[in-house]
Swiss-Prot record:
It catalyses: O-phospho-L-seryl-[protein] + H2O = L-seryl-[protein] + phosphate; O-phospho-L-threonyl-[protein] + H2O = L-threonyl-[protein] + phosphate. One of its GO terms (cellular component) is nucleus. It comes from the Eukaryota. The keyword Repressor does not apply. The active site is at D112 (4-aspartylphosphate intermediate), D114 (proton donor). Keywords: Hydrolase, Magnesium, Metal-binding, Nucleus, Protein phosphatase. This is CTD small phosphatase-like protein. One of its GO terms (biological process) is negative regulation of G1/S transition of mitotic cell cycle. Binds 1 Mg(2+) ion per monomer. The keyword Metal-binding applies. Mg(2+) binds at D112, D114, N223.
Amino acid sequence: MDGPAIITQVTNPKEDEARSPVAGEKASQRNISLKKQRGRSILSSFFCCFRDYNVEAPPANSPSVLPPLVEENGGLQKGDQRQVIPVPSPPAKYLLPEVTVLDYGKKCVVIDLDETLVHSSFKPISNADFIVPVEIDGTIHQVYVLKRPHVDEFLQRMGQLFECVLFTASLAKYADPVADLLDRWGVFRARLFRESCVFHRGNYVKDLSRLGRELSKVIIVDNSPASYIFHPENAVPVQSWFDDMTDTELLDLIPFFEGLSREDDVYSMLHRLCSR
């Protein structure tokens, strides 16, 4: 197993730029576009969570398939807008335990790890916040982890407002020790890894119907639309983060989630946002 197969990531546009002048020009255009998007109102950034993607859900009689070890979620190809059909039948055994007394009455927020809260690399990062040793085929490799700006404030506030669950398509041997270092406050009530995803058409999908929580009270925060193709109406999408230390997206999200925590269900507020 090679190093990158441990971590599920999107491609850094800067790496595309380094490969070729043509790719670099396209990457630069993407970077400019992303910076413009960050400058918009935080409310407008949520509109994309209701875009329909040209990706089919598994048939109703199709059992959940455990994913093989491949490198990363592929990007979704935008085509004709079609309705995404949710995954039909929930499993007999849910991924999460019963809600604790501490979290009773709170909504459940599923939070992604890579490029949402942190960026990790097998290449040395001079200003890495953590260096995590990971064993691959009998050899110890160092993973350099950079924290997204304001991740500490974001996690602490989210832990006060919601039942928080870490759900990553990366392997536990990498993600678990990173979560130990990142979550100093015990915000995550549970941690779900690649084996808890559904492998569907080359992507690791986080099927929210398998959590054991009422879907109207579940939100997923993720940088990859492929991760929530079964439940796009539950998603609060974020921009992929790599190394921009001026990024404020997590900080900007806090007031939105403070309002969402007071709603009866997640759909009402998200629908109101899209109708503006």
